[in-house]
């Protein structure tokens, strides 16, 4: 069962999180586990730790969202809806107009996301499309978790989006080295915070992304 402890260190999430919201997160995690028997949403080895490994890990990204000027978040290759659905659930009572756009090319996973969105009455848009084929997209936040390497995410942001404010990424223990390597081809600013669910991981917010001229 999920309780308030699983987000106790997230400074924004912990403020006024209703019992109803926590219950929705719990039901969402149970839905993932149930559906995981039919389609591969998450690794079966992480089912027992889904609250921390997936739900809380996704929830902590809300610390990087400025709720006053952020209206749209786009989740690339969302899979089971992590972190997009978690953010939609958390933001629903705080800012109902906050919209999460989720890209997932799998038919079965997209249908699961639609069922979840309908069940919890979430402000989402589910796109069963290949993000690499989309052009002139607009959003406030681009977010990606366990989808593609950082250089690929940067290329998608640069080529497929004509407008965005920043990118939120989940990085592992080599995150600093990955950003350093990316800086050889890209100019960007970033803020980082240590992951609340893994001592070796980082959550980073990338802004002012520009490709360096050769």
Regions found by a protein language model. Name each.
Residues 1-68, 74, 108-122:
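Class I SAM-dependent transferase core
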Residues 174-214:
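Active-site capping/gating segments
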Residues 105, 170-174:
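Short strand-turn motif at the edge of the Rossmann-like AdoMet-binding core
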Residues 146-147:
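Short glycine-/small-residue-rich Rossmann-like dinucleotide-binding loops
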Residues 99, 123-125, 166, 187-191:
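Conserved beta-strand segments of alpha/beta enzyme cores
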Residues 32, 170-171, 206:
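Residue-level signal for inorganic ion chemistry
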Residues 154-167:
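A short glycine-rich, Lys/Arg-flanked "PGG" loop and its adjoining helix->strand segment in the class I
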Residues 59-143:
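Conserved SAM/SAH cofactor-binding pocket of Class I
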């Amino acid at each position: 069962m999920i309780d308030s402890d699983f987000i106790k260190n997230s400074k924004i999430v912990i403020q006024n999180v209703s019992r109803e919201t926590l219950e929705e997160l719990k039901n969402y995690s149970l839905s993932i586990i149930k559906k995981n028997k039919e389609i591969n949403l998450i690794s079966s080895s992480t089912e027992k730790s889904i609250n921390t490994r997936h739900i809380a890990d996704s929830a902590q990204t809300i610390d990087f969202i400025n709720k006053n000027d952020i209206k749209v978040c786009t989740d690339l290759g969302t899979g089971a809806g992590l972190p997009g659905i978690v953010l939609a659930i958390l933001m629903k009572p705080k800012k109902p107009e906050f919209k999460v756009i989720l890209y997932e090319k799998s038919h079965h996973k997209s249908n699961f996301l639609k069922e979840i969105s309908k069940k919890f009455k979430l402000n989402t848009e589910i796109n069963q499309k290949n993000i690499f084929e989309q052009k002139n997209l607009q959003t406030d936040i681009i977010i990606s978790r366990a989808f593609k390497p950082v250089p690929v995410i940067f290329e998608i942001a640069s080529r497929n989006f004509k407008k965005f404010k920043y990118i939120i990424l989940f990085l592992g223990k080599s995150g600093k080295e990955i950003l350093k390597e990316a800086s050889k081809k890209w100019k960007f600013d970033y803020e980082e915070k240590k992951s609340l669910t893994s001592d070796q991981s980082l959550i980073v917010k990338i802004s002012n992304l520009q490709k360096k001229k050769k």
